[in-house]
Amino acid sequence: MVLGRNHGTVMIAEESTAWPKVTGKAEDDGLGFSLKWNMGWMNDFLEYMKLDPYFRKFNHNKMTFSMTYAYSEKYVLVISHDEVVHLKKSMLEKMPGEPDDKFKNLKAAYTFMFCHPGKKLLFMGQEFGQLREWSEERELDWFLLGEEKHRDLKDFVQTLLKMYRKYPALYGTDTDPSGFEWINADDGDRSIYSFVRKSPTKRNNLLVVCNFTPVERPDYRVGVPKKKQYTLVLDENGQTAKKVFKAEKQDCDNRPFSFAYPLPAYGVAVFQY
């Protein structure tokens, strides 16, 4: 009724009991919500990101399990105020390591989040690395933007948002299983994930690589779907220099074509093809 009477309205459900068809149509015995919070993804994602990088290889499936049910509902990936209050720490402070490591971890985390199927919700202040937990009794710590690391994180999230809007591959097939393909979901030893997001037109698809360890991989080889040119459109520095890598005939990740890329510690790379 609400959706029918108010054009442009979005109704989002927070539900954690696995009740079926929350976003299904009412005429199909669904509840009729526009979107549902993906609580499973959120819990697994945050548990993984809080781990010391050494132990991530033993928890590799926490970042892949969500794809086994990603199309059962119309999901929104949520980092809400609930996750940055009551001694749970801010997103930046959840990350392991020294301050520089925390920022690098968070950039990798946000890249994975923005490239994973599902709409996005990131609570205010987490885009620039708020240190204190959120409180309704005070404003955000805007003074942190006077520090280079926090400005750099804000700029990186802004670049992610621009990339998200530019490429329909990141949103146009959120509810279509054919819009996602793992390249390598099983590289737990190196804690690297690689996958493809496909656009509705099958053009301007994106190849995504995320490294969740402080180990540099100077000759990281990634298998690719086709023998084409792959243009770098985002890296961990927020650079969009559009370097081009040409696939060659060399087996990798159970695919006949691949290319090598210098993947930094906590590095991310998004390629358009």
Give names to the regions the model predicted.
Residues M1-K120, F128, S135, G172-S178, ...:
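Alpha-amylase-like alpha-glycosidases and glucanotransferases acting on alpha-linked glucans and related
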Residues D100-F103, F114-L122, Q126-Y273:
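Carbohydrate-interacting/catalytic domains
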